Amino acid sequence: MSKLNRRQLLKAGAALTAAGTLASQAFAQQEFYARPPTLLPARRTARVVVVGGGWGGTTVARKVKQQRPEAEVVLIEPKPLFMSCPMSNLFLAGVKPLEFLVFDYTQVVNDGVVFVQERVLDINRDRRLVRTTGGYLAYDFLVLAPGIDYMYEAIPGYAEVKHLLPVGFKPFEHVALRRMLDRFDETGGELVMYIPNPPYRCPPGPYERAAMLAWRLKTKGVKGKVIVLDANPQPISKAPGFLAAYNDLYKNQLEYIPNTRITGLDYEKKRVKTELGDVPFTLADLIPPMKAAEIVRQVGLGERWANVQPPYFLSEKDERVYLVGDITGNTPYPKSGMIAYVSGNIVARHISQRLGGKALAEIPPELPTNVCYSFVDSEEAIWVSNAYSWDEAAKQIKAQSTVDNQRSAANSTAAYGWAQSLWQDMFGPRA
């Protein structure tokens, strides 16, 4: 494809000036997609492009390729490595090393998936083109699994210092947070956490983190305390199990304060402002409200979250686009790694059937299941599971939950087995 020369650029600039804003936008979009290099040769078979190499996206890419070897499957992910957020509180607490959570995409590529380490800049759904930092890709089916962004603006004073306060709910942010915790071991003081109202990624995650950080302080003999400011009236998942652990195990290391909203942050004075007054901190791990990644809004698939067509994972605005993982907003599913993984399997089967010639109306709905283990110390865990069914008459998804709030070593063993099983299915056995 020819490159723009100087004369073409000058002509384009003159046209933009003369035509006005609307015309310039249309022209820019046309040139944006018409001129950049293609990342791959023109496809000779159906192409499935997956944006995001997390729990959901990696699963979709690998499973579609396994089920439809003749299809071209492309996985676009800016990071060269995968890090699991589920089980990451064990790393923060010092129970497990970082390598326990990290995998490469070697086996995914060996399966025949094309791995493109790029960042997605835009998507033209009319022309079925994905624009990345290196060029563009045409697709037949698109899977969006880009994860979440933080709403720093919801807490006045946070956005200006976000680089100083890693949240630890996106992959690899945990490394900086762990370094800060290591320094806190030496100073002690107040380790203030904030938990927002849902929806956010991994509902039990902050409560597990609070317990494991309290375990860390207790085990290391750090003269400090974890102060948990919760916007909710109680833990939003497995409340009896978490509260029992806080009271039984960490009376001197953890203070849990429910019904408390943050109204601002003064980082210079090391104070969190709340409706009940200021709370001083030595180290803060403040979890802001969350939203779907920016690409969702940029391409017109939603605002805070993107909506699907229940009971399927198809975008309500585009039947060539699937939405997987934490970005969806109109289902009762928690934003968990397990839901992303299971829905990734479901989406892969759905796409495979469409590639095989089935119409949408011919494909019966599949709904995910969920299980979530939460550690409360280095050896014990609690869990919750969810099963979902489709009520055709009511046109809605129904949920049924089972909870084990009794912490036990058996649950801990099950948690490790669960994680290892899913990681192996996504990335193959460890070398």
Model segments located where?
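N-terminal secretory signal peptides and thylakoid transit peptides that target proteins
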Residues: M1-T17
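Glycine-rich, N-terminal phosphate-binding loop of Rossmann-like dinucleotide-binding domains
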Residues: G13, G134, P146-G147, P288-P289
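Glycine-rich dinucleotide-binding loop and its adjacent helix/turn
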Residues: Y33, G147-T219
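Beta1-alpha1 glycine-rich phosphate/pyrophosphate-binding loop at the start
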Residues: R35-V114, N197-K238
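C-terminal auxiliary extensions adjacent to catalytic cores
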Residues: R44, W383-A431
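A Rossmann-like FAD-binding core segment of flavoenzymes
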Residues: V113-D122, V130, L137, W215-R304
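FAD-site-proximal beta/loop scaffold in flavoenzymes
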Residues: E160-D185, P280-V342, Q353
